[in-house]
Swiss-Prot record:
E.C. no: 1.2.1.41
Protein name according to UniProt: Gamma-glutamyl phosphate reductase
Source organism, top-level taxon: Bacteria
Keyword tags: Amino-acid biosynthesis, Cytoplasm, NADP, Oxidoreductase, Proline biosynthesis
Protein function: Catalyzes the NADPH-dependent reduction of L-glutamate 5-phosphate into L-glutamate 5-semialdehyde and phosphate. The product spontaneously undergoes cyclization to form 1-pyrroline-5-carboxylate.
Top enzyme category: oxidoreductase
GO process annotations (BP): L-proline biosynthetic process
Catalysed reactions listed for this entry: L-glutamate 5-semialdehyde + phosphate + NADP(+) = L-glutamyl 5-phosphate + NADPH + H(+)
Length: 415
């Protein structure tokens, strides 16, 4: 079957979803999670085939790798999504016009959502659970790196759908080639929305070539500013957590900005980073402050390319500033508008930072690692939107709906 026919089938299958009861949707999600638990070894075997084709030193390796613990977490996330309130048929507003006509603004599914992602097999289940719960069919375009894993996961989803009499095309996995990507991006009339999840180069490619509406997600160039009034204890813990908790995710710290007056505390703030072999690219003042305290093999002089880079690795840059205005200027120039944090004890500085930094998530005395749908209480997320239209920040169930107007009357005609 060619890709165009697969997309037509997904579009047709989406119409069946509208008629499903909430109880049916919840039951299918719970059953799918349970089947995943009983087929863990099958999925791990497929994942091992993918891992064998990738260098363990590749930053994508950690994202690609599935473990029994991670699969248990994926199943739990799906069960959690099943417990969330349905985002559909919510009356957003209701007005009665002078002529007696009633107008209701009601949430509805998009229809078919295409998601393009790289070496992240966990996204397969996250996308299906969120799309299915919100009444949308999903078209999955995973990367070739994760093809064995994705196919194993979709087989589990299809087995449950078929057993329940649901058209399995509501979860369609496209071939992992570039031609399929091109077909998806041009599928006007068959696909209602495309969400890319991955590197900045992937997102740029989708933005440049898509004819279908796109919500950009994923790329995170994240900064943390240690202010003149910052608590160094908080700074040490936050910087270490934001950088080393999981380097391959989009909310990981890429650049520490530090006020010049606090350079003497920089060795303490960076004290835990050598435990994870974090390579630091420091500007001249920061390099001088660290040179006798940080391992020589892990400390390098920064250049212009050190800033504005999403490392996705045990690497980070450090920039020294003399004022909040310099901080704001640096972030405005290099940020991907994902997650930015300030460590400060001065309420006015925090207020200005929160007000003037243009990002989806702006933190004060908190690690950027919390930019996550589950951590925000949304359940699993389909991605972190870095744009402003329709959705911004972690995208969960409400962001996967649009609305329509329902108008009722009693024979009214317009003069």
């Amino acid at each position: 079957m060619n890709v165009k026919d697969m997309l037509r089938q997904a579009s047709d299958a989406a119409k069946q979803l509208i008629t499903l009861s909430d109880q049916t949707i919840i039951g299918i999600l719970k059953e799918t999670a349970q089947v995943l638990r009983t087929h863990t070894e099958e999925v791990l075997a497929a994942n091992r085939q993918d891992l064998e084709r990738m260098d363990p030193a590749n930053p994508k390796y950690d994202r690609l790798k599935l473990t029994e613990e991670r699969l248990q977490g994926i199943a739990a996330d799906m069960e959690n999504v099943s417990t969330l309130p349905s985002p559909l048929n919510k009356v957003l507003s209701e007005t009665i016009r002078p002529n007696g006509m009633v107008i209701r603004k009601v949430t509805v599914p998009f229809g078919v959502i295409g998601v393009i992602y790289e070496a992240r097999p966990n996204v397969t289940f996250d996308v299906f659970s969120l799309c299915f719960r919100s009444g949308n069919a999903c078209v999955l375009k995973g990367g070739s790196d994760a093809d064995f894993s994705n196919r194993a996961l979709v087989r589990i989803i299809h087995s449950v759908l078929e057993r329940q009499g649901i058209n399995p095309a509501v979860c369609t996995l496209l071939p992992p080639d570039r031609e399929a990507t091109a077909e998806l991006l041009g599928a006007v009339g068959l696909v209602d929305l495309i969400i890319p999840r991955g590197s900045s180069s992937l997102i740029h490619f989708v933005r440049e070539h898509a004819k279908v509406p796109v919500i950009e997600t994923g790329a995170g160039i994240c900064h943390t500013y240690f202010d003149r009034s910052g608590d160094k204890g908080k700074g040490r813990e936050i910087v270490n957590n934001a950088k080393t908790r999981r380097v391959s995710v989009c909310n990981a710290l890429d650049c520490l900005i530090i006020h010049r007056e606090r350079l003497s505390d920089l060795p303490y703030i960076c004290e835990k980073l050598p435990d994870s072999n974090v390579i630091i690219y420091a500007d001249e003042p920061a390099y001088a402050a660290l040179s006798e305290h940080y391992p020589e093999t892990l400390l390098q002089q920064a250049n212009e390319n050190s800033f504005g880079t999403e490392f996705l690795d045990y690497k980070m840059s450090i920039r020294t500033v003399s004022s909040l205005d310099e901080v704001l200027s640096h972030i405005a120039r290099y940020s991907s508008k994902h997650s930015e944090s300030i460590i400060s004890e001065d309420p006015e500085t925090i207020r200005r930072f929160q007000q003037l930094v243009d990002a989806a998530c702006v933190y004060a005395n908190v690690s950027t690692a919390f930019t996550d749908g589950a951590q925000f209480g949304f359940g699993a997320e389909i991605g972190i939107s870095t744009q402003k239209l329709h959705a911004r920040g972690p995208m969960a169930l409400p962001e996967l709906t649009t609305y329509k107007y329902i108008i009722e009357g009693d024979g009214q005609t317009r003069i």
